[in-house]
Amino acid sequence: MSESDIYWTFVTASKYAGSFYQAMGNAGLAADPNNKRRILAAFPEMVATYGAASRLHQTMRAGVAA
């Protein structure tokens, strides 16, 4: 994942996820690069649901309201 993909994964989770993944998205946005990758490695379902391949991620990145 590129740094941009990682950023948008956390932004997408912080907006569209349930409360736990919203908190993880916010934590990821505040984290340093090493801890961002640790969060994503610990929660692969977060990447699957809100990562670059997801429609939500692509919508957020395109700036289209979902």
Feature-to-residue mapping (PLM):
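N-terminal acidic leader/helix
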Residues: 1-26
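Short intrinsically disordered terminal tails
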Residues: 1-4, 58-66
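Short, charge-rich amphipathic interface segments used for partner binding and complex assembly
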Residues: 22-56
